[in-house]
Amino acid sequence: MAKQPTRDDVARLAGTSTAVVSYVVNGGPRNVRPETRKRVLEAIEQLGYRPNASAQSLSRGRSDLFALLVPDLANPYLAELAQRLEEEFFRRDMVLVVGDSHDDQDRESTILEAFRRQQIAGLAWYGVTQPLPLDLLEDASFPVVLLNEPDGHRMGNHPRITRLVADEQEAARVATEHLLQHGRARVAMVAGPKGRHNARERIRGWRLALREAGLEEGAVIHGPFTRAGGVQAAQTLIDSGADAVVVSNELQATGLLRELHCAGVAVPEEIAIVALNGTALSEFLWPPVTSVDVPVSSQAEAIADFVTGTDRAHDLSVTSRLTKRASCGCSYSSKE
């Protein structure tokens, strides 16, 4: 096997020092004269030299790796976010690495520590608990975007931590109001686990819409943000006499639709459905599910801008939008 060219080989061919080669490869810390830089780059190309990524990370104090830590990559919303972030960072000559905590706090802490050892350039974190245990990032030197840190909770004094703000309450209010516009009067809520901040916020939005319409609250059914959570909610929903339901995410909606179909309950004729945090998958469920969506591409761009330093706003905000399909009773064609 041919010997891999080294930095010494590049320096020898370019007629300069290994330190100067390092400055060219790492983009600093010292400037290099244009003619010298040209010789070094030509030597690198001629020899086929490939810089050691780990060594570059050590010299710069960071790598070209951006990390995403989520509790469940099976969640279509989080999977789509990972895909969009990968595309966004690839355009910026960075690589995305993804950790899945499986909704386990110990696993989450282990992954965070592994990311830190890799000297990542930045982190987007959707945590298992709320508020997030920010003490784990107390001395972090990289920018961090918190994807589900509750508004109003302490952010510490870390100048490079920001929060991506999505108005969960407003999204649930919009979903509920849309069902009311279809003449539904007994609107239930399939929420997330008890105690989760985003579950509480969605319930608040649902209650607000019902209160403003002068209607009594329907059933609130708690369960995990999974297909199994939707499956488990189905019988309670049927027994409650609801004629409509706001479902907290697309995974729950998938499980719920299957169970309603198995029980012979027609959607939307008997129970209309609107899901929160929808993705492109909602169009391919049956019936296609009306959803309140977060623009994932906009989220990914905002995260990348913050991490790369082009936007250092304290909070990054995104606005949800209602996508009308058939599960609520709207007329819908996939060709529209």
Task: Indicate residue ranges for each PLM-predicted region.
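Short beta-strand segments enriched in small/hydrophobic residues
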Residues: T18-S22, S59-D72, H178, R186-P193
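Hinge/beta->alpha junction and helix N-cap segments in small-molecule ligand-binding domains
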Residues: A53, P71-E80, V98-R107, T162-V174, ...
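Flexible loop/turn connectors
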Residues: L237-E336
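N-terminal helix-turn-helix DNA-binding module of bacterial transcription factors
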Residues: M1-R62
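Alpha-helical recognition/docking segments in bacterial nutrient-uptake
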Residues: M1-A2, L65-E177, Q235-S240
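Short acidic capping loops at alpha-helix termini that bridge into adjacent secondary structure
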Residues: R186-V187, E217-A219, A266-A272
